[in-house]
Amino acid sequence: AGTDQEHPRMIVYSHTVTPDRTTFLLGKGPDPTEYIKDGLNTLIGWGADMLCVTCNTAHHFIDGFRDEISKPIVHIIDETILKSSQVCPQGAWLTATLGTMRTGLYQRHAKDSG
């Protein structure tokens, strides 16, 4: 976009009481699934017609209920793998949280995409 007016309209929702995703995945905290799902449905209620979650680890939970959400979700893992394969077909490095690494999100989605 060349100007502010050319950017898409966005709603940002930061629900700061959502339990830490990595802490849960390491067995040390509460499950954040319902908070994440509630946040997505809140955005839909506010008029969002497409959703994007910028937390890699959150997609571990989103994968479990993605079909329950009535609007499309831009999946950060799938989009990263797609772009990485176009830019660097021989492979790419990943820097991520321990939670993202332990879930095997990128490995699983990369395998599924071929």
Residue ranges and their predicted role:
Residues 1-114:
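Non-catalytic structural scaffold of enzyme domains
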